[in-house]
Amino acid sequence: MIFVIDCHIPYLRGVLESQGHECRYLEPEEINASTVRHADCLMIRTRTRCNSTLLDNSAVRCIATATIGYDHIDVDYCHSNGISVISAPGCNATAVEQYVDAAIRTWLKKRHINKLPIVGIVGVGHVGTLVAKRWQDYGAQVLCCDPPRERAESLTDFKDIKQLAENCDVITLHTPLTHHCEHATYHIVSDEILDIFSGNNKLLINAARGGVLDEESAIRHTNIDYIIDCWEHEPDINKTMLQHCFIGTPHIAGYSAQGKANATTMIVRQINKLYNLGLENWAAPYQRSRTISDYDIMADDRALRDAPNDFEKLRSNYKFRE
């Protein structure tokens, strides 16, 4: 088989080659219709948009993204053209939860807030569940909003997003990015919700997906603090939004060594199930780097403010936590 692989996916070099497969490691901007034309499988990250422009007239039959989400992949196109889509749900949930914990605690300290906030969580999946547990363990009141889960599981204690805006000090977003469907999340937080939420000592965190928060609306609501890791129009982020942020980071909330190892392991094993590559027991090795107790979120904020045009470079060269 021929694999075209984003060269920034860690732990992969030599793994598939050891089983006799051809691997071409490319920068994200080098993955295009020409370079994927003869590939059987793509192994990518969110920087690669997989749609008809990339895939028409190609040999690709499998796309594996080493990320929890797949809104960068035209799933309908893939399904209608016999292309399997693989992702790594939950791979970096612990890392994102730790980022959110560090973000809220940094905000409380810098704003000299000495009481536990009421925390609202929008999207209670892998990450949101961990965030809820952390802050409940601290003794904080936690309100959860997740309409699909609420309906599917007949949950009675979940709230709608307006109730979170009315009652919470902190709202943190952990949804996928969806369009044109029931409970679509595109711009789920815009003027209406921000009007309700506005006030002193209010914090909104987006470590979910760019586009869940309407950044133009956020810029108009100046009395809310924003901690933004996921931005609209990445890597060409809104510089005004960055200036407006309490903390801004270059989409690295999920960047831990363990999270990256988990993602690589998950997609390799799923590809193995499809193609019987002899890698059913393979696991990516990783070595611990910085621990969360050492993590200085303000250092990541400074790096982005110093070089906002280097957004992708900051991501690609980021030293993994944990």
Label the predicted regions:
Residues 6, 40-111:
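Phosphate/diphosphate ligand-binding glycine-rich loop within oxidoreductases
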